[in-house]
From Swiss-Prot:
Designated gene of the protein: NOP7
Basic and acidic residues composition-biased segments: 331-342, 584-619
Molecular function GO labels: ribonucleoprotein complex binding; RNA binding
Protein name (database record): Pescadillo homolog
Assigned protein family: Belongs to the pescadillo family.
Job of this protein: Component of the NOP7 complex, which is required for maturation of the 25S and 5.8S ribosomal RNAs and formation of the 60S ribosome.
Keywords assigned: Coiled coil, Nucleus, Ribosome biogenesis, rRNA processing
HAMAP family cross-referenced by the UniProt entry: Pescadillo
Taxonomic lineage: Eukaryota, Fungi, Dikarya, Ascomycota, Pezizomycotina
Region of interest (Disordered), ranges: 313-358, 471-660
Length: 660
């Protein structure tokens, strides 16, 4: 006979452990336990039955796997936390004795990050454990980038120290430099929350959110201690990723950083990239102002030129001794033309012909020179323009260092990005000097010849469509086209604002819209006729008043009686039509086109009714399970169709208002 199992020794009671028990087992404080769980990727678990795990468990009790807590017992960071706890006790005892000097000495020896910048511990081994391969780290980079870009834009407080913000900003700028060098950026989208970016790195799509450069207001209901724990982990992760990405393209990491330029607002221009590919590949050279900072050594260059000249002289002598090249038969001259694959026999396979790629999306802005006005978002525009090949970007000196030029009148500028309304400076014709201060200059409307002026959305739409959009649609003060998300794939039958309304509306919608337009036109015509009748009646009344002194009371009573009789007759016709099911016969004959549209609408309704009846009969042949599934699918499709119908109706109304 087997032994009886004791209660709480197996099953769910042994597989789960409460948070209080875990903290006691690890001999940690609750904040340190939270840090350790965040860094190691251990999350609370919900058991199937709380009563079986613990009878004293309440709704707020947090459970963990016992194996996860057992795994934390071997973590090297535990000893670091315990040493820190012992040190804090020593400092508190020294302060209790009144020995301030001893407490200060202990604090200096602790090498705290907020005092000396030296970390008490590192998370390198945690990164290696959680991400065995580099692809695993790239897949978890979305939240990392979003969090670090958020903290890079926060103001410094007691909960968010300035050193943490500076470290986040530097890591983010290093990552942006890699995207610029490797042309890995693919799409971007302007939203209410911020700017979304999508990059493709080693086959992995990475999507992150960057907030706008506004003054952030830090509220008190956000726990920045927990967020700071995530940021500390993500900073280590992005440092590893940046090192791997830089070395993969032959760049030195970390890149050279100019603190003086960064203090002057250079941001991307404060970094100078160095590496193997910088000297040979023009696409990956260090760009701060559009050109490399370090040139070749003049002595070495002179020796190289001398050797090249000697080789040229020797090759010319050999060519003169051998004779002219025209005497050689069958010599083929080199050509840049692409070979054509032609079928040898008639009826052979037709092979696809090779062709030069006329447009490279990664070099979309490579031939253009931009100037950014002061009201435009300089940081995001500079990054996205450089990521797509632009090397010459200028802006006003008040926006910071690192520009290609600060002269707005530079003739090499091809595009200027503006985001201000067109100012109409109205001059006073009478010559009064009241508004002379506001209208004495036309600087905001000044335009340089040979330059295109566009709004910032032109850059994002061109990047998402992989082609330069027409600048006429994005001119200053123009009503911009809809800015659609490039991350949403259009589905068949769904509303698409880029397609004309006539191509995506149903037949019934088109007929209803035409009938509505016809009714509106008929109503306008009747209003005009009524106005004309009223005007003619008023003229006749005026003439009668001129001829006669007044109108008799009997004539007024006769007119009112006629109106009452006509109204009663009209009501009688409506009641008879309602009883018989026929339409009310109007005074005017119906237009032939309107009548044809009404007939088409009735035929369409009959067709829909017959299709619905056929569908109901087909549903009766299904099983109960399949019928429920089919009805659920119908409900979802009808809901989407109703939403699309509302959008099309709204668009139709807006188009009518524009035409009016």
């Amino acid at each position: 006979m087997g032994k009886l199992k004791k209660k709480g020794q197996s099953g769910q009671a042994k597989n789960y452990i409460t948070r209080t028990q875990a903290v006691k087992k690890l001999q940690l404080s609750l904040p340190d336990f939270r840090k350790l769980c965040i860094w190691k990727g251990i999350y609370p678990r919900e058991p199937r039955s709380r009563k079986k795990v613990s009878k004293s468990a309440t709704a707020s009790t947090t459970f963990y796997y016992t194996k996860d807590i057992q795994y934390l017992l071997h973590e090297p960071l535990l000893q670091k936390f315990r040493d820190q706890k012992v040190l804090e006790k020593k400092i508190s005892r020294a302060l209790g004795r009144g020995d301030v000097g001893d407490a200060a000495r202990l604090e200096r020896n602790a090498a705290r990050p907020d005092k000396t910048g030296k970390p008490r511990y590192t998370l390198n081994h945690v990164i290696r454990e959680r991400y065995p391969t580099f692809i695993d780290a790239l897949r978890d980079l979305d939240d990392c980038l979003s969090m670090l870009f958020l903290f890079a834009n926060l103001p410094s407080t007691t909960a968010v120290p300035a050193k943490m913000i500076a470290r986040c900003e530097r890591l983010c700028l290093e990552f942006e430099h890699y995207l610029i060098t490797s042309h890995s950026l693919r799409k971007s989208f302007l939203s209410i929350k911020g700017i979304y970016y999508q990059a493709s790195i080693q086959g992995e799509d990475i999507l992150w959110l960057v907030p706008y450069k506004f003054n952030q207001r830090v509220v008190g209901d956000v726990d920045f201690r927990i967020m700071g724990t995530f940021v500390e982990f993500y900073m280590t992760l992005l440092g590893f990723v940046n090192y791997r990405l830089y070395t993969a393209v032959g760049l030195k990491y970390p890149p050279k950083f100019d603190q003086l330029k960064d203090d002057q607002g250079a941001e991307l221009g404060a970094f100078a990239l160095e590496g193997v590919n910088i000297a040979t590949n023009d696409d990956t050279k260090a760009i701060t102002n559009g050109e490399a900072e370090h040139g070749p050594d003049p002595k070495v260059q002179a020796e190289v030129d001398k050797i090249v000249q000697q080789l040229r002289v020797e090759s010319d002598d050999k060519a003169s001794e051998e004779g002219p090249a025209d005497d050689v038969e069958g010599e083929e001259k080199p050509s840049d033309a692409i070979d054509k694959f032609e079928p040898v026999a008639p009826g052979g396979d037709v092979l696809p012909q090779p062709s030069y790629s006329s447009s490279d999306p990664a070099q979309l802005f490579s031939r253009l020179t931009f100037f950014l006005s002061r009201e435009t978002p300089r940081q995001s525009l500079e990054f996205i323009l450089r990521a797509f090949g632009c090397k010459r970007i200028g802006w006003d000196s008040v926006l910071g260092e690192g520009s290609f030029t600060t002269d707005e009148s530079d003739p090499s500028i091809t595009h200027q990005i503006v985001d201000r309304p067109v100012v109409q400076a109205a001059m006073n014709e009478e010559g009064d000097g009241e508004d002379n201060q506001t209208s004495q200059k036309v600087g905001p409307n000044h335009r340089y010849p040979g330059r295109l002026y566009v709004q910032p959305q032109w850059v994002w739409d061109s990047v998402n469509d992989e082609e330069l959009k027409s600048p006429e649609l994005y001119g200053p003060g123009a009503a911009l086209p809809p800015h659609l998300s490039p991350f949403v794939k259009p589905t068949q039958g769904q509303y698409d604002p880029t397609i004309p309304l006539e191509e995506q509306q149903s037949e019934g919608e088109a007929i209803d819209a035409e009938l509505e337009d016809a009714n509106e036109e008929a109503g306008e015509e009747s209003d005009v006729e009524n106005d004309m009748d009223v005007a003619s009646d008023e003229d006749e009344e005026e003439e009668d008043e001129e001829e006669f002194d007044g109108v008799s009371v009997s004539e007024e009573e006769e007119g009112s009686e006629d109106e009452e009789e006509s109204a009663t007759l009209q009501r009688q016709r409506e009641l008879e039509a309602e009883i018989s099911g026929k339409s009310v016969k109007g005074d005017k004959k119906m237009d032939a086109k309107t009548k044809a549209k009404l007939e088409a609408k009735k035929a369409l309704e009959r067709k829909k009714k017959s299709e619905a009846e056929d569908l109901e009969r087909a549903k009766g042949m299904l099983s109960k399970k399949k019928r429920k599934l089919f009805e659920q699918m119908q409900y979802t499709n009808n809901k989407k169709s109703a939403e699309d119908l509302k959008l099309r109706q709204k668009r139709r109304r807006l188009e009518k208002e524009k035409k009016a």
